Amino acid sequence: ARDLGVDNDMLRVAHRYAHGSLGLALIDFQRSGYMELWDPSHTTVLHASGALHDAWEQSVSDPALAARWEALRDLPDGALGREVVKFYDARGFTFPGTPKSAPPLLAQHDWVHVLAGYGSTVESELEVFAFISRANDDPHAFSLLAMVISLFETGYLASGAGLFEYDRGHLSHEGMAVRMADAMRRGALCAASAGHGTDLLQRDWFADAARSVDEMRGELGVVPKSDRAIEMGSMTAWEKGGISPFQYNCGRQAADAAGRVYDAYGAEPPS
């Protein structure tokens, strides 16, 4: 790192991990990463009714926020917001503002799942956060990628982002290095398109909700995946392998509870 002229606080985190000082590493991680930049004023783009004092704070009793999400159902097929609703319904996810929902900030990354064309398995989560981290030119954003690797490869973090629980070994799966590299390539091109990088977790996606997915991809410089990444198993949210068995079952149960026919919109669990 010294030879490459790299010197930032996240190096201290890496050193702590390398020496087995996981508790100290976690403290450094929280102080040096993306979450340290959080300010309650950032709540505005999330449309939560009250200020959120922690980046990953949940909002489980906010009728106005829940209604804003529910209104996305009225958008036409192909609109970004409508496709996000499909993403939620297929997996049994609940909207922010309702019980058992993801933190509003974490829900921001669900728009990127749809926009960038990634499914919702753990492997796809690694791809999404690689894309988001590289699209942002602020080095603090790298901590988002470090977080998901610590959750879903090393297990150094037991939990993260107010919802995720650790599940080791997913980056080691065959083809994941190619898929992660391609996600970072696409994120870099997105950053270049913006001229100075873009923080996709701080975008007001509701302002874009009625626009088509294709239009938004063009505006933000989201290029197609490489053929090699697809060959290595990179999936969209709408095909076989793009949803986990647990999510598929949750989607069915949620549809039954709501009295509607379940539709996974083409998604199937991997074989």
Sequence positions of predicted segments:
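Proline-rich intrinsically disordered, low-complexity coils
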Residues: 40, 96-99, 104, 224, ...
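Small-residue-enriched hydrophobic alpha-helices in membranes
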Residues: 2-56
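Generic preference for flexible, low-structure residues
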Residues: 16, 22, 27-30, 34, ...
